[in-house]
Amino acid sequence: MKQISIALLPCLCTLAGFAQNGKALDLKEIVSGKFTPKNISGVIPIPGDGEHYSQMNADRTQIIKYSFKTGKPVEVLFDAATARECTFKTFDSYSFAPDGSKLLIATETTPIYRHSYTAVHYIYSLKRNLDGKINNIVEKLSDGGPQQVPVFSPDGNQVAFVRDNNIFLVKLLYGNSESQVTEDGKQNEVLNGIPDWVYEEEFSFNRALEFSADSQMLAFIRFDEKDVPSYSFPLFAGQAPHFTPFEKYPGEYTYKYPKTGEVNSKVSVHTFDIKSKVTRKINVPVDADGYIPRIRFTQDPNKLAVMTLNRHQNRFDLYFADPRSTVAKLALRDESDTYIRENVFDNIVFYPENFSFVSEKSGYNHLYWYSIGGNLLKQVTAGQYEVQEFLGYDPEEGSFYFSSNEESPMRSAIYKIDRKGKKTRLSSQAGTNSAQFSANMKYYMNRYSNLDTPTVITLNDNTGKTLATLMDNAALKQEISGYDMPRKEFFTFQTSDGTTLNGWMMKPADFSA
């Protein structure tokens, strides 16, 4: 029988387990952020370079390269103050080309919904001159206006993006020449390459646009929402932020919002041949009221993965489609008596000859290994526990890396299973662990905390050996020890149907009942 973890009361933070022998908590101190653990965010492993990761500085003016072995800075990859032809002083985010040769830098970011936004993007080449120094020139991606979801081609020589619900393509080797791929995009009618509101909200993604492995094809999902009912709400001036246009009269925002029982967008998958400029519709057998929550090219340029769900979201199908012939063949089907969790989509990772898949078909969430043809080769994990996240596969060692709650539903740990099936726990501390691996799977950054320990961030090799401690929040732990903190109490109980539930409750430090 599955175990389900529940939280019965809200928590101040994970520091609720310290001794009750000191000062009382003060509301001003709580809301000031005084007890918030320090963290390291925005870490991006550098593609094609298994030894380093990158991070932008606190001022959002630089992108710095760090060593996975030591955690020490190695080089400043980008500096807005010194880059040539750079017209911005700060930036909001960035991403690498798949081969690590270029950066895509986002500025003037404007949020749309939970995951979506527009931004003005710039290209920065990391190509080095004969003296070993980076070329150091910034180029604007497009002069046509802000962009959504820009994505590099695998060879790093093209960028596709969406503007005003249409797809555009920029060829970087031809003076950043820009061409329009779709023409029918229109607000509240048709979206190309980006999901509508309900897809973005329910399936947690903001890009439905992919390049083929050989950089010769584009694939995208088209959302036709013309028949979806509209919903409107008023816009007021407000205070933070303040909108001047609505000071005297409120405005109105209208978008397509399908309530229960109403029609969703009609979705279809299309491909665009960059050389011939031919657009084709893929023949995917999706239900009329079904969903296409993801598309993704495999490492075979002639094999596009299309993922579908029925309206009840309890049947998942994975199709492999030929982007030119448009023929789609069913590779995998997974069904549930309840529903398919959305973490299935992003735990599917394609390798040259295989792909990973996570399913609850055994009663617990486990990792499976398939051939690229869709044949199940083996069940990688098994037992009465849940795989929480597939972290990657090392083809050289034949090893799988993942996080799971095998020790307890209240904990998470990092594990490795080698080609012989031997399982090794890599994280050494009991509590909550999460990991981010290097591009070559030789190193990882581990984030750990438990009831008595604020976040500790370490760098480790793939045997679990700690190479460096980046942050331990020791000062915060010492500070907290001087306060009367409420303490979490863990417990389990059984429901009337025999399901074991895990929970915790937190009482005031002076609670005596």
Task: Walk through the language-model features, giving the residues of each.
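Structural motif
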Residues: 60-65, 113-120, 164-170, 227-233, ...
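Signature of short aromatic-glycine-proline-rich micro-motifs recurring in repeat-based ectodomains
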Residues: 38-44, 88-95, 194-214, 294-295, ...
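Non-catalytic accessory segments flanking enzyme active sites
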Residues: 41-44, 51-65, 74-77, 92, ...
